[in-house]
């Protein structure tokens, strides 16, 4: 075979053929169309060599088997038929692997996803390592697609219908223990003996597939299948609000295969794959995927970052505890937490312990690993142990003088190279750095709550921040598992600035007589994960609204909230879920009682009308203000690219991913249409809807954001 091939064949002395997967020049193995000829040549050689007793597929990469198919292949398809042909080619290749006359074993270490798992499913057996890096799944639905190389047909027959539906409809990934329990893999072994174990299994006679559990056998029958599909379809529709056509097609394709046979199932799978590839939803989701990949590769600066050996954190509260967790347990860096109160340190340590303990209970990690990771976190009530910290992240109260004091203390007690990164959500970084002796090493690093779950961070340099500081903080954020966007130091930064008018308008709709649940339902139907009112309850009404006066002072009355409404709610001691009093009623332990609205809220906010707008009208008012503000941020250079604006909105506030983010969405509508809608809303509701100069200019010139943002503003 050609040494540049991604697939190479080696026939051992014991007559076991080992096919090694190693895509040249790439960190991850991904399947590309041009590899089909390489694999077919190997399969032909195996079929012709009558001495071969078995076959093992194994990866040469350090931490992945096959991470999936190359998504660019789909972008090169111009029609549904071309994408369907791509799927049929994949199906045929997998069928040829499955048809080999000797046992074929997939030896899996690391990520085995998408087309990688479909290849493993085509094998006669699967062994995986017990490593935490090993995950197995079919995430195509997250790109608005379905598995197109036989996954919708082989997986249900291997693991049962309910497990397969859960995996394919959600993109859920299984860890080794879960994969073994479900029957997805036959054996778990240490990485050191993976090849040896796979070879031994390949020498054995082909084993008959394991019998499915009784529950799965019942669900596989016509009656059980009918009931399950009806239940899952209803549940899926509630979750997707009809915005993701892939889920419906997945159900149809799997049902076709089970009721009409595999041949019909494969045919339906290929057709559905082709049609879904051409949908706007899949295109938008793929755009988000590509944009996210680009952001993760973007160093944030042309300058080399500094070293990152140890990190300090000021404040052991909710944010400090979360930042300590991602720094120690994801970035793998030693963390020292300073809090004036020992209870604060204990809180932060307990926070990480609880998160790790949940992983132990779910058997994602072992108790020894939990202890090893916790050992990276220490605490102090003074600056002992801070002298050599490379970065100190401040996560104290939103008080300017306190943060300035923290800067002075860090400059006094830490090294000359130490970077001060503030987790402020509202205070300008230039103000925090105003009295710094080394302002070039002061920067904003805005995490979102809960830190361990939210993927986005905003990196906020002020005018004097050095390029090296920017590069170092971007590097740290990536190590912490975050997707960083670099934004300008202006009031509200980017995410909170576009979120505020959206929240304000929802509150204004309440005062006009719209019901809480009507507003939230309308925006969830549009595609947000939760409505704006529920979002306020979740983040805390006090926390979620504290930015509004800051924005109003900076940008004027378009950011003003309805008079006295927020203060009236807060004066009634309503902070949302965290104190069990908000717009919604909360039961024991802060759990919502079927998301019922507290009727008292309408008396508190002094409703002044009986508005009865349609869901579309409600959505339009809230979303158009967000879009207009995003366009302003683009014009002012708050974000460097439309790409960063889309990633920030999708990852930071849950802007509907299937729309591609605010800038992709505006491009799909067209600037002229966005301007026309804003002008109509201005005539109906006032000047806060006045279209910004950026949109007016783009409408006049027929421009779009993505075509005009190819160059870096940096």
From Swiss-Prot:
Its main location: cytoplasm. Keywords: Cytoplasm, Fatty acid metabolism, Isomerase, Lipid degradation, Lipid metabolism, Lyase, Multifunctional enzyme, NAD, Oxidoreductase. Its EC number is 4.2.1.17, 5.1.2.3, 1.1.1.35. GO terms for molecular function: 3-hydroxybutyryl-CoA epimerase activity; enoyl-CoA hydratase activity; long-chain-3-hydroxyacyl-CoA dehydrogenase activity; NAD+ binding. Pathway: Lipid metabolism; fatty acid beta-oxidation. The record marks 118, 140 as: Important for catalytic activity. It catalyses: a (3S)-3-hydroxyacyl-CoA = a (2E)-enoyl-CoA + H2O; a 4-saturated-(3S)-3-hydroxyacyl-CoA = a (3E)-enoyl-CoA + H2O; a (3S)-3-hydroxyacyl-CoA + NAD(+) = a 3-oxoacyl-CoA + NADH + H(+); (3S)-3-hydroxybutanoyl-CoA = (3R)-3-hydroxybutanoyl-CoA. Residues 1-190 are annotated as: Enoyl-CoA hydratase. Transmembrane segments: none annotated. It is found in: Cytoplasm. One of its GO terms (cellular component) is cytoplasm. Residues 306-714 are annotated as: 3-hydroxyacyl-CoA dehydrogenase. Heterotetramer of two alpha chains (FadJ) and two beta chains (FadI). Catalyzes the formation of a hydroxyacyl-CoA by addition of water on enoyl-CoA. Also exhibits 3-hydroxyacyl-CoA epimerase and 3-hydroxyacyl-CoA dehydrogenase activities. In the N-terminal section; belongs to the enoyl-CoA hydratase/isomerase family. This is Fatty acid oxidation complex subunit alpha. The gene is fadJ.
């Amino acid at each position: 075979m050609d040494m540049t091939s991604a697939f190479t064949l080696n026939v051992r002395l014991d007559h076991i053929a080992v096919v090694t997967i190693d895509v040249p020049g790439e960190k991850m193995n991904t399947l590309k169309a041009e590899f089909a000829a390489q694999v077919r040549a190997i399969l032909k050689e195996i079929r012709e060599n009558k001495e071969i007793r078995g076959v093992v597929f194994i990866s040469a990469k350090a931490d992945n088997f096959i991470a999936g198919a190359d998504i660019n292949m789909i972008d090169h398809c111009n029609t549904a038929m071309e994408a369907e042909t791509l799927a049929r080619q994949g199906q045929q290749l997998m069928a040829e692997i499955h048809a080999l006359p000797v046992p074929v074993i997939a030896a899996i270490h690391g990520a085995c996803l998408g087309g990688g798992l479909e290849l493993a499913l085509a094998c006669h057996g699967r062994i995986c390592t017990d490593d935490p890096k090993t995950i197995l799944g079919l995430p195509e639905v997250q790109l608005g697609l379905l598995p197109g190389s036989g996954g919708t047909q082989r997986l249900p027959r291997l693991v049962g219908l309910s497990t397969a539906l859960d995996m394919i409809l959600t993109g859920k990934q299984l860890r080794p223990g879960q994969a073994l329990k479900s029957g997805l893999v036959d054996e778990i072994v240490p990485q050191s003996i993976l090849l040896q174990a796979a070879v031994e299994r390949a020498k054995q006679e082909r084993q008959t597939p394991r019998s499915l559990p009784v529950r799965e056998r019942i669900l596989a029958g016509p009656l059980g299948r009918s009931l399950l599909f009806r239940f899952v379809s209803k549940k899926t529709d509630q979750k997707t609000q009809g915005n993701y056509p892939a889920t419906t097609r997945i159900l149809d394709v799997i049902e076709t295969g089970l009721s009409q046979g595999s041949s019909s199932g494969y045919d339906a799978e290929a057709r559905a794959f082709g049609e879904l590839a051409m949908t706007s939803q899949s295109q938008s989701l793929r755009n988000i995927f590509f944009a996210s990949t680009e952001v993760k590769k973007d160093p944030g600066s042309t300058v080399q970052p500094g070293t990152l050996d140890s990190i300090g954190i000021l404040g052991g509260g909710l944010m400090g505890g979360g930042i300590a967790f991602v720094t120690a347990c994801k970035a793998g860096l030693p963390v020292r937490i300073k809090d004036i109160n020992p209870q604060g340190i204990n809180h932060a340590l307990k926070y990480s312990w609880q998160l790790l303990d949940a992983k132990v209970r779910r058997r994602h990690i072992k108790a020894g690993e939990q202890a090893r990771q916790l050992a990276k976190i220490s605490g102090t009530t003074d600056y002992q142990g801070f002298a050599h910290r490379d970065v100190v992240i401040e996560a104290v109260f939103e008080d300017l003088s306190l943060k300035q004091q923290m800067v002075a203390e860090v400059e006094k007690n830490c090294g000359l190279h130490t970077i001060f990164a503030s987790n402020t959500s509202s205070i300008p970084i230039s103000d925090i750095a105003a009295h710094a002796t080394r302002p070039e090493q002061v920067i904003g690093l805005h995490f979102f709550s809960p830190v361990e779950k939210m993927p986005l961070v905003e990196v906020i340099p002020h005018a004097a921040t050095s390029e090296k500081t920017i590069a170092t903080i971007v590097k740290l954020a990536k190590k912490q598992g975050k997707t960083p966007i670099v934004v300008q130091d202006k009031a509200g930064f980017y995410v909170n600035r576009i979120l505020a008018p959206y929240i304000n308008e929802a509150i204004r709709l309440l005062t006009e007589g719209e019901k809480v649940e009507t507003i939230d339902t309308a925006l969830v139907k549009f595609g947000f994960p939760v409505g704006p009112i529920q979002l306020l309850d979740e983040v805390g009404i006090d926390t979620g609204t504290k930015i509004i006066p800051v924005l109003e002072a900076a940008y004027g009355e378009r950011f003003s909230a309805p008079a006295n409404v927020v203060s009236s709610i807060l004066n009634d001691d309503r902070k949302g879920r965290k104190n069990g009093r908000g717009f919604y009623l909360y039961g024991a332990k802060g759990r919502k009682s079927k998301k019922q609205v507290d009727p008292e809220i309408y008396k508190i906010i002094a409703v002044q009308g009986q508005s009865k707008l349609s869901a579309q009208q409600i959505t339009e008012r809230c979303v158009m203000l967000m879009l207009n503000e995003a366009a302003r941020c683009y014009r002012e250079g708050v974000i460097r690219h439309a790409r960063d604006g889309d990633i920030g909105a999708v990852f930071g506030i849950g802007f509907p991913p299937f729309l591609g983010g605010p800038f992709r969405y505006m491009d799909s509508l067209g600037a002229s249409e966005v301007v026309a809608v804003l002008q109509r809303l201005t005539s109906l509701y006032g000047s806060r809807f006045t279209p910004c100069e950026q949109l007016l200019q783009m409408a006049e010139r027929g421009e779009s954001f993505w075509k005009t943002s190819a160059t870096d503003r940096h």
